[in-house]
């Protein structure tokens, strides 16, 4: 008659070795692999915080631009960005130092209006503040000069 050893799974001598290896593997995963994966994901997320990474910055507004979205420099992205939201809900990155982009953003701060009662062109502040964009004093001075020119040309007013 052949003798067979009946092993209970808990009392199996191989189980102890496997459980120690399993515990070592688990400890390795917890202390080495998981922090490394979290660190790599944080670096990947850090690159995505700047919305215009590795994209060509356009110097003019693309056709079909619905609105402009200036984004301030912050801790996660150290540069100022301007996004153009298109009518088809796409986005394009614009160069915030380009003249065409600055002109469109500056128009949000000051307006040149015609006061019908006094028959005079005047520069009016819109009181809009962007954290991402300083108030353009040079643009305001340009509008004042242009208003003076229009007032002289249309109404022969001198200041």
Swiss-Prot record:
Keywords: Disulfide bond. GO terms for molecular function: chemokine activity. Disulfide bonds join 50-77, 52-93. It holds the Pfam family IL8. Signal peptide: none annotated. InterPro entries: Chemokine_IL8-like_dom, CXC_Chemokine_domain, Interleukin_8-like_sf. One of its GO terms (biological process) is defense response. GO terms for cellular component: extracellular region. Belongs to the intercrine alpha (chemokine CxC) family. This is Putative viral CXC chemokine 2.
């Amino acid at each position: 008659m052949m003798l067979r050893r009946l092993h209970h799974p808990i009392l199996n001598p191989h189980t102890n070795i496997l459980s120690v290896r399993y515990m070592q593997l688990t400890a390795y995963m917890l202390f080495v692999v998981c922090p490394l994966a979290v660190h790599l994901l944080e670096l990947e997320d850090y690159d995505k915080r700047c919305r215009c990474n590795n994209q060509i910055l356009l110097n003019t507004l693309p056709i079909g631009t619905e609105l402009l979205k200036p984004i301030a420099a912050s801790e996660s992205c150290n540069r100022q960005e301007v996004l153009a939201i298109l009518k088809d809900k796409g986005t394009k990155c614009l160069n915030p130092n380009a003249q065409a982009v600055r002109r469109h953003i500056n128009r949000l701060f000051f307006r040149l209006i015609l006061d019908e009662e006094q028959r005079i062109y005047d520069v009016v502040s819109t009181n809009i503040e962007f954290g991402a964009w300083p108030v353009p004093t040079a643009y305001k001075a340009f509008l004042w000069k242009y208003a003076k020119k229009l007032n002289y040309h249309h109404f022969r007013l001198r200041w």
